[in-house]
C-alpha cells in the first residue's frame, strides 16, 4: 500500500468514520479508465461536435458540446444521466455529480493559475472532480503530468478524455502524461494506494473546483489531500462561500480543515461579484 504517513488500519478507520456519518448511499467504486491505442489513432469526434472557447485570458480550448453528449448517453440508456436530465438536475447524490457542466469557479481557478503564474511545468497534478477537464488540460498545456478524476465513468469517457485528445497535439502524451479515474473519493484513496506505492508518486498540486458543496463528502476530500499530496505540495480549492440548498461552503470547509490540524489555509483570491467565490490554498503545517 501507499505509505501515507499513517498506518493502513488508521486509513481504514478514517473511511469507516466517514461511512458511519453519511446517509447510506451506494457510491460507485473507483476505477482507472484506460485510453486505448484505437482511441488515440482515430478522429475522436466530428468537427460539428466541439467548439473552440476562450476560457482563460488568451487560452483557447476545444470542448465537446455537452448537449450532444447528453443525447448520446440517453440513447445509450445511461440511467444516471437520463435520471438527472429527467429531473432537470445537475446533482443526484451517489448517481450523478454534475460532471457534464463547466462550473463557474473552474473559470476562476484557471484564470488564477495563469494570472499568478503558478508553476506547472514538470509538476504532478491531480484535477479532482475534473468534469470537462479544463483545469487539467490547462496544466497539461503548461508542461504538467495530470491525473483526471471525476465521479461518473460516463463523464470521463464521453467528455474528459475526448476533450484532452482534442487539445493535445502529440497524442502519445495522453498515455505518457495522463491517467483517468472515476468513482467515489474514499474508494479512490484505496485504489490509488494500490497503484502508486511511493511517496514520489504523490502530487505536487491538487486542483479542485466546486467540490465542497456537500458537507457529507468534505471529509473524503480532506483525506485525499492529506494522503496524496507531497509534503511540499499545494492544494487549490475553488468554490462558493455558500452553496444554497446543499449546505456546504468555504467557511464551513475551512472550519473542517482547521479542526483536523493538518493544513494551513490561506484565501488567495476572492470575488464579491454575484455569488461570493473564493480560492483557498492548503499547505501542510510545519
Task: Label every PLM stretch briefly.
Residues 1-286:
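S-adenosylmethionine-dependent methyltransferases
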Amino acid at each position: 500500500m501507499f505509505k501515507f504517513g499513517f498506518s493502513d488500519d488508521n486509513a481504514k478507520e478514517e473511511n469507516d468514520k466517514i461511512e458511519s456519518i453519511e446517509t447510506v448511499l451506494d457510491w460507485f467504486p473507483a476505477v482507472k479508465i484506460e485510453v486505448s491505442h484505437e482511441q488515440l489513432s482515430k478522429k475522436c469526434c466530428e468537427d460539428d461536435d466541439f467548439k473552440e472557447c476562450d476560457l482563460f485570458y488568451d487560452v483557447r480550448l476545444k470542448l465537446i458540446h455537452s448537449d450532444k453528449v447528453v443525447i448520446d448517453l440517453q440513447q445509450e440508456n445511461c440511467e444516471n444521466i437520463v435520471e438527472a436530465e429527467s429531473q432537470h438536475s445537475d446533482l443526484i447524490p451517489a448517481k450523478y455529480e454534475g460532471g457534464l457542466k463547466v462550473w463557474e469557479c473552474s473559470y476562476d481557478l484557471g484564470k488564477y493559475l495563469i494570472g499568478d503564474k503558478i508553476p506547472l511545468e514538470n509538476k504532478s497534478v491531480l484535477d479532482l472532480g475534473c468534469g470537462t477537464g479544463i483545469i487539467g488540460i490547462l496544466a497539461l498545456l503548461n508542461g504538467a503530468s495530470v491525473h483526471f478524476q471525476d465521479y461518473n465513468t460516463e463523464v470521463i469517457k464521453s467528455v474528459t478524455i475526448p476533450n484532452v485528445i482534442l487539445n493535445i497535439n502529440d497524442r502519445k502524451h495522453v498515455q505518457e502524461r495522463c491517467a483517468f479515474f472515476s468513482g467515489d473519493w474514499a474508494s479512490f484513496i484505496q485504489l490509488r494506494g494500490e497503484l502508486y506505492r511511493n511517496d514520489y508518486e504523490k502530487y505536487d498540486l491538487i486542483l479542485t473546483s466546486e467540490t465542497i458543496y456537500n458537507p457529507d463528502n468534505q471529509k473524503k476530500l480532506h483525506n485525499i489531500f492529506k494522503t496524496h499530496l507531497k509534503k511540499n505540495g499545494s492544494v487549490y480549492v475553488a468554490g462558493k462561500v455558500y452553496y444554497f440548498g446543499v449546505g456546504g461552503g468555504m467557511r464551513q470547509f475551512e472550519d473542517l480543515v482547521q479542526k483536523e490540524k493538518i493544513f494551513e489555509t490561506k484565501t488567495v483570491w476572492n470575488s464579491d461579484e454575484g455569488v461570493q467565490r473564493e480560492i483557498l490554498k492548503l499547505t501542510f503545517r510545519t
